[in-house]
Amino acid sequence: MKIAVIQGPNLNMLGIREQHIYGNMSLEQIHQQLQTAAEQNGVELEFFQSNFEGEIVDRVQECLGTVDGIMINPAAYSHTSIAIKDALSAVNMPVVEVHISNIYKREEFRQKSITAAASTGVISGFGAFGYHMGLIALMQMINELKAIAQARNAQIQAQTEENK
């Protein structure tokens, strides 16, 4: 199982900026902890961070056929990017949107997430632990989709055998 972890603008400044909102862990520390949890569960992670909308769109599109799911923190682009929302919709795979802070307790302009409409689910307000929650959710969704596909294939094979 492979999951892309895509981080949006200013998340490279975690641990430095607004610690009262985002905590004191750096993005690298969050990734290290997430990597450890993934390895314990046999999951491969690919990490990506960009401050540029087009690069995030490109990375989402590159996920098609190469990963089983996406965990994304679009950061400020959550509230503005139809392009990222459209890219997430286009790849048609499990997507978990993660926000470190509770966007619903923040300024009004931060309380609407455009990208959430293309996400399977949203985790908001649990700090860095939200990424672990996202990993667990994605593993469960991906395993369920694989089980459904296997059952469907077994059913088709059984019907084919009956028709012989």
From Swiss-Prot:
It comes from the Bacteria. The lineage of its organism: Bacteria, Pseudomonadati, Campylobacterota, Epsilonproteobacteria, Campylobacterales. It holds the Pfam family DHquinase_II. Gene3D superfamilies: Dehydroquinase, class II. Pathway: Metabolic intermediate biosynthesis; chorismate biosynthesis; chorismate from D-erythrose 4-phosphate and phosphoenolpyruvate: step 3/7. This is 3-dehydroquinate dehydratase. PROSITE patterns: DEHYDROQUINASE_II (PS01029). Its EC number is 4.2.1.10. InterPro entries: DHquinase_II, DHquinase_II_CS, DHquinase_II_sf. The record marks 17 as: Transition state stabilizer. CDD domains: DHQase_II. The keyword Lyase applies. Homododecamer.
